[in-house]
Amino acid sequence: KIPEPDLKNFKSDCIPTSKANLFVLRILGVPSAIDFIPHFANRNGRHYWATAIDPRINSTQVYQVGIYKAPKIYRRTYSHNPTAKPGKREYVPYFFLDPFNKDVTDLYIPTSEIRLSAPGIRNIRHGYLAIFNDLSWQPIACSKPAGQEIIFPKMGKDIVYLPVHYTNKKEMVPFAPPLILYSDGTVHPIIANKDSLQYMKLVRKYPNRGESDYWYSAFIDSHFEAADNPDFKSPHSICTI
């Protein structure tokens, strides 16, 4: 029996939910696995879900894949998959050392490969593509250079990526400018031009999405309060939505 305080404080998200759904499928004898997006490319967070392993339903739509940008989608497997082989004293994020992550991005979304040539690629053992999530750059794909070129296959489109590598001190360092992979498969580097500046005014800091309208309606008639003391005594209403 679970103690009542533990039940009150229990929080669940897509990870335990996906595991519960996975157990149901396996109890029914359905071959299944957990697929996941480690990091979204256009919002904070990630998503995990259980899926049946059947080529006839690989195109089944996952809600979060349809409304958010997925740079990579992986599957947890029993069999080993290729992993990065670190050199002496080379730092590689643990995710890319885990042999039970399989790239299944192309089962869900259109993808393209990214080919990069840049000075210094020859001097790194592994390169990564990172996306911005939760206030920092998160590595999402790993590849090994061949000469002065490095190739990243099966990348999600309409996404900004930053090519990086790691120092022996675990520091992330860009080895090329950030780039955009467009929907037609073309790659465009983003290079700042300090001689041609422009004025930009941001009216919001988070994308406005239609699926959020339901939540927005809950704020109607809400109001903001302010007080001139740390204890927030005798607050005054300053704005009503």
What kind of feature is each model-predicted range?
Residues 1-4, 9-97, 101-106:
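Hydrophobic/aromatic-rich core segments of domains that either
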Residues 28, 46-48, 112, 125, ...:
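Residues that flank catalytic or metal-binding motifs in active/ligand-binding sites
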Residues 55, 149-170:
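Short Pro-Gly-centered beta-turn/loop motif in secreted/extracellular proteins
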Residues 112-121, 203-210:
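A short, amphipathic beta-strand motif
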Residues 120-136, 214-226, 231-235:
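Short, ordered, surface-exposed loop/turn motifs in non-cytosolic proteins
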Residues 135-148:
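Short, acidic Ser/Thr/Gly-rich low-complexity loop/linker segments typical of extracellular
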Residues 167-195:
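Structured interaction patches on ligand/partner-binding surfaces of diverse proteins
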Residues 239-241:
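Beta-sandwich interaction modules
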